[in-house]
């Protein structure tokens, strides 16, 4: 049904909570794909809490590279880019997400669950699935189909290290009118300021690096990705 791709470091209890809340509310069988770091001091705790089939251990690397490695391993057609801080709060969330993809023959769609935050500047109360206009949607986690991944060659744009992944992907999806906000599914998340978050924010100037990529190269890559996805939509079927 759905594969979760989740790089995780220093948060074994949160990783376990994600698995527990997703499985307690799923209708089908979710595939959990965690990427863990071999230099994480909490690695053994992960191994104690998670089923061995749910994780891969490797060197510390960019979050985007980890997301893409995990997406390549995903067995299910719908793939979710996830963080380890999520608590799944909606019963049959997987069936609800699948239902939205079933409405599109080509399966070119980005589904963005609610994370509990106010959405954009729209002046009406949104209660139903909504194709989002071309304005930012503050939610970091999303689902796409393998047709999307196979068309572009990646789940997370590989020219970023960690930041702007949701911003970039939403921009692509909104330009082709395929960014679907799904308020009927809640993946509760909040910004953390623990050692893991601080490591990403302070290590190797990652924020400024991704800022520069977003500022200098996004226009060319956006245009190319939009064109490729529009070709699939025009043809009426996925790859």
Mark where each language-model region is.
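Short beta-strand-to-loop acidic/aromatic patch adjacent to the donor-nucleotide binding site
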Residues: 77-87
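Short beta-strand-to-loop element that shapes/binds the nucleotide-sugar donor at the catalytic cleft/hinge
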Residues: 109-135
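C-terminal catalytic/acceptor-binding lobe
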Residues: 161-239
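Short, acidic, metal-binding catalytic loop of nucleotide-sugar glycosyltransferases
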Residues: 20-30
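N-proximal low-complexity "stem/linker" segments adjacent to membrane-targeting elements
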Residues: 1-21
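Conserved donor-nucleotide/metal-binding helix-loop-beta segment in metal-dependent transferases, i.e.
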Residues: 91-110
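Glycine-rich, basic loop-to-helix element that forms the pyrophosphate-binding segment
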Residues: 57-74
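Short beta-strand/loop segment that forms part of the nucleotide-sugar
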Residues: 29-41, 56-57
């Amino acid at each position: 049904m759905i594969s979760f791709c989740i790089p995780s470091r220093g948060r074994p209890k949160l990783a376990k909570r994600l698995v527990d809340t997703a499985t307690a509310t799923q209708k089908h069988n979710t595939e959990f794909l965690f990427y863990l770091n071999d230099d994480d001091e909490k690695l053994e705790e992960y191994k104690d809490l998670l089923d061995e089939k749910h994780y891969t251990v490797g060197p510390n690397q960019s979050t985007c590279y980890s997301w893409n490695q995990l997406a390549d391993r995903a067995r299910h057609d719908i793939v979710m880019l996830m963080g380890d801080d999520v608590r799944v709060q909606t019963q049959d969330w997987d069936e609800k997400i699948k239902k939205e993809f079933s409405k599109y023959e080509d399966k070119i769609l980005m589904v963005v669950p609610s994370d509990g935050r106010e959405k954009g500047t729209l002046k009406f109360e949104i209660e139903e699935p909504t194709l989002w206009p071309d304005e930012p949607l503050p939610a970091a986690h999303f689902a796409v189909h393998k047709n999307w991944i196979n068309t572009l060659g990646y789940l997370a744009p590989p020219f970023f290290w960690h930041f702007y992944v949701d911003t970039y992907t939403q921009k692509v999806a909104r330009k082709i009118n395929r960014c679907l906000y799904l308020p009927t599914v809640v993946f509760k998340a909040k910004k953390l300021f623990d050692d893991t978050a601080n490591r990403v924010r302070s290590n190797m100037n990652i924020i400024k690096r991704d800022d520069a990529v977003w500022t200098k190269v996004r226009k060319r890559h956006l245009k190319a990705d939009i064109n490729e996805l529009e070709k699939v939509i025009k043809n009426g079927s996925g790859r």
